[in-house]
């Protein structure tokens, strides 16, 4: 009997879009929203330039290296495909993009979803796809199924001298609290076990809406950080706060952390420890109060993890001011720290500051800073040996499960290597208690306690992107 290869005529006609997503988690959420709308309208998302009828590049433009990466990605897409639509933060500088690549089809700024869709429609009209109902109600995700970024606002009201985010993303615009909670609920129904709350300034959430009340689950919630956290705690999953500005009312969420309703984790960028440098940065400069608050947070919630970021080599930074930054690390005993050497950002007011620090000095200071924090991190992780940590499995590698504890955000913090993960048959998305047996400067090592595994349910939606 002769076999017949069935060809779906509708599928062959489906317009195909390639997608490149660059930048921070907030840009990743923008990409997820565009991809979801593309699928709802019947476009197929393909993992290569060759298979695509048109390519969308979501760019980053925060620092010079990100601009270079974005321009390189646009060039790669132009060379491989030729039909390219550009969006994202670098899209706020269309002249820079068109000077390099005058043949791009369209350029739009961040979170301008309508302009992206209009450009796609112009280049590639949508066609009916009977399978679009298969798009899950939580949309298309670019993260693994067990965690998701939850963006609560756009833009920022601050004018830090080293930052150009407001010029690219505008002033703060908060999403209504019920809209955010409904999205979180959909994500949890889809299998998400960790919600990572992101914005440019999470602490200021709702100030532009005058903290308006909105209904969700038969009660009223203010559009405010604490009320949002109270609502998210009702969903029974990990909730992690990122990009928290050091306002006094941050203390309001500490009781939720102490009660186990919110992950005991604060991501607060302090940026420096010199009052003069902080003033030049246009950041809060009460360093002694900052140290007091860190100690108060630890007293209120002993399990809290405090992550922060810093800039070394800011214009005018003296040797003494850098030493004060190292002293701050010693006193604050932060758990997780990131740092980078200052570099001028196109359009930032800090570019006009006098007394730039020589590049070799910046790099030497950065190395000393990271070495100091590595010592602190190693001691703080060593203190966890013998404890039991709840962990979320991210990856299975040979016989080892690679997970994160409640103290570790994806991609930026440490890992927990579960030595008996393969033996126990752990899977990505499982929640498991792990007895810690060893540590190094960044990671923990241990064995899972088999009686305390919460398995991941359902099946993941696998979507491979360019």
From Swiss-Prot:
Subcellular locations according to the entry: Cytoplasm
Enzyme class: transferase
Binding site for [4Fe-4S] cluster 1: 24, 60, 89
Protein name, entry field: Ribosomal protein uS12 methylthiotransferase RimO
Lineage of producing organism: Bacteria, Pseudomonadati, Pseudomonadota, Gammaproteobacteria, Lysobacterales
Reactions catalysed: L-aspartate(89)-[ribosomal protein uS12]-hydrogen + (sulfur carrier)-SH + AH2 + 2 S-adenosyl-L-methionine = 3-methylsulfanyl-L-aspartate(89)-[ribosomal protein uS12]-hydrogen + (sulfur carrier)-H + 5'-deoxyadenosine + L-methionine + A + S-adenosyl-L-homocysteine + 2 H(+)
Known function: Catalyzes the methylthiolation of an aspartic acid residue of ribosomal protein uS12.
HAMAP family: MTTase_RimO
GO biological process: tRNA modification
Keywords from the named record: 4Fe-4S, Cytoplasm, Iron, Iron-sulfur, Metal-binding, S-adenosyl-L-methionine, Transferase
Domain Radical SAM core as annotated: residue spans: 142-380
Binding site for [4Fe-4S] cluster 2: 156, 160, 163
Matches recorded under PROSITE patterns: MTTASE_N, MTTASE_RADICAL, RADICAL_SAM, TRAM
Domain of life: Bacteria
Species annotation: Xanthomonas oryzae pv. oryzae (strain KACC10331 / KXO85)
Keyword RNA-binding: no
